A protein has these predicted regions:
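C-terminal motif of bacterial Sec signal peptides marking the signal peptidase cleavage site
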Residues: 13-17
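Bacterial signal peptide processing site
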Residues: 18-22
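Beta-sheet-dominated interaction scaffolds and their linkers
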Residues: 28-73, 77, 160-190, 288-297
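Short, solvent-exposed loop/turn segments enriched in Ser/Thr/Gly
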Residues: 65-71, 125-132, 185-192, 256-261
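Short, hydrophobic/aromatic beta-strand segments
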Residues: 79-88, 126-130, 200-211, 251-252, ...
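Intrinsically disordered, low-complexity Pro/Gly/Ser/Thr-rich segments with frequent PxxP/GP/PP motifs
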Residues: 92-124, 215-251
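Terminal connector regions
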Residues: 121-162, 248-284
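Surface-exposed beta-loop interaction hotspot
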Residues: 138-223
Length: 297
């Protein structure tokens, strides 16, 4: 038991120092990350002899969210090391089983995390029932209940399904160029959020607010409130967001996962929701370059 507890504490210390908060979608999901705190407590076995069981827990860090994945952490409370040859997660909210990746040794009375790629198109709608994990090792297959105390799957499915619905009305993206009022330290830039209607009639998208990131914030403070109204068969809308660096310390420039991922609060046909809009690689590069210049780096 001491080895398992030591491993959990080590993971806690490591992840606390290197991950942030976040949320959903392949290549989607900082302060704006839609994922939740990484380390929900895994159900630890009782003290005493090994229970002879495996325990599974879903977790997601901000980096996981940015990479469009979550992780299943498997605690091995048996007397033998376990090396999975196959891990499969099934969930009624996903259209097909999701295979585990980076399969490797899980020592006795320890735990290991295995990535699970989040599906680009989940089963949107009302789908109920628990997720299950099937683990194959040493010639046998066991089915495990899975804890998800932080609702990683529910949060992802809600956000991704909203994103798909918005894409059918007016996809949102940031322009790749960042305009600046002047070069050098103290400058103010302008981000442009573009809503391009699909032409399908009968829908209205309202953009109420856009949250900042650890690196980039509204020039006037707090969140941007563009209050844009986009008709699904109307013209393209370009919402200008004056921006300044939120911080200028070296550490924030190393936290790349959520630096250019913005939480957008909106209403689609009157239904409120929020989703994360990430800048393209070209746009992210331009935004980070602006922040460095404005910070005087």
């Amino acid at each position: 038991m001491s080895r398992l507890l030591g491993a959990v504490l080590a993971a806690l210390l490591c992840c606390t120092s290197c991950t942030g908060t976040s949320g959903p979608g392949p290549g989607r999901a900082g302060s704006p990350e839609p994922s939740v705190p990484t380390l929900s407590p895994i159900r630890l076995p009782p003290k005493g002899p090994p229970t002879g069981r495996l325990y599974a827990d879903l977790r997601q860090s901000s980096r996981d969210a940015a990479l469009g994945r979550m992780e299943v952490w498997i605690a091995n409370d048996t007397r033998r090391d376990v090396t999975p040859t196959r891990i499969t997660y099934t969930d009624p909210r996903f259209r097909r089983p999701v295979p585990g990746e980076r399969l490797r040794l899980d020592p006795s009375r320890s735990e290991r995390g295995y990535p699970l790629a989040l599906p680009a198109v989940p089963a949107c709608g009302k789908h109920r029932g628990p997720g299950r994990m099937r683990v194959t090792y040493a010639g046998r297959t066991v089915t495990l209940p899975v804890t998800d105390d932080n609702d990683v799957v529910a949060r992802y499915v809600a956000s991704r399904c909203l994103e798909l619905a918005v894409d059918r009305v007016a996809p949102l993206r940031f322009a790749d160029r960042v305009r600046v009022d002047r070069p050098g330290e103290g400058s103010t830039g302008t981000l442009v959020l573009v809503a391009r209607p699909t032409g399908v009639p009968g829908h209205v998208l309202r953009i109420d607010a856009v949250g900042g990131t650890p690196l980039l914030g509204a020039a006037a403070g707090a969140a941007w409130r563009p209050r844009g109204r986009v008709r699904s068969d109307g013209p393209v809308q370009r919402l200008e967001l004056p921006v300044r660096p939120a911080r200028c310390d070296d550490h924030v420039f190393m936290e790349s996962a959520g630096a250019t991922a913005f939480l957008v609060s909106l209403r689609l046909d009157g239904r409120p929701g929020s989703l994360v809009v990430r800048m393209s690689p070209a746009g992210a590069s331009a935004a980070i370059a602006f922040a460095r210049d404005s910070c005087g780096h």
